[in-house]
C-alpha cells in the first residue's frame, strides 16, 4: 500500500492536533477517560498523547480529528488552526480520488 502523505506531513498534522487536545477536550467538557473510550484507547494512553509523552498513530489521529470535527464547538476551534482542516481534507481527498469518494 502506497503512502498517501509522507511521514513529516503526518507528524506535522499530529503535532498540531496534539497541541490542541487539552483545549478541544475542555471545550466540550469531557474527561480524558471519556474521550479515550470514544476513540478506543486507554485513559493512560490518551493522557500520554495529551501531554506529549507519546505520539499517536495516524489512525488515532484520524479518530480524534473526526471526533472533534463532528462537534460544532470544537470544529470552530479547529478552524482557528490556520490551514489545518484544509490540509487534512487534502490528504483525504487524495485518497478518495483513488477510490471515487468525495469529501467536503
In which residue ranges do the predicted regions lie?
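Short basic helix-loop element that most often maps to the first helix and adjoining turn
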Residues: 19-35, 63, 96-98
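DNA major-groove recognition helix of helix-turn-helix/homeodomain DNA-binding modules
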Residues: 59-80
Amino acid at each position: 500500500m502506497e503512502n498517501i502523505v509522507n511521514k513529516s506531513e503526518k507528524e506535522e498534522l499530529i503535532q498540531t492536533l496534539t497541541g490542541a487536545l487539552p483545549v478541544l477536550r475542555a471545550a466540550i467538557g469531557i474527561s480524558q477517560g471519556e474521550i479515550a473510550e470514544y476513540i478506543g484507547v486507554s485513559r493512560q494512553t490518551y493522557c500520554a498523547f495529551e501531554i506529549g509523552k507519546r505520539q499517536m498513530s495516524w489512525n488515532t489521529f484520524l479518530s480524534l480529528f473526526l471526533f472533534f470535527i463532528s462537534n460544532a464547538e470544537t470544529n470552530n476551534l479547529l478552524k482557528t488552526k490556520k490551514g489545518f482542516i484544509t490540509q487534512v481534507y487534502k490528504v483525504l481527498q487524495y485518497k478518495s480520488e483513488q477510490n471515487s469518494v468525495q469529501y467536503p
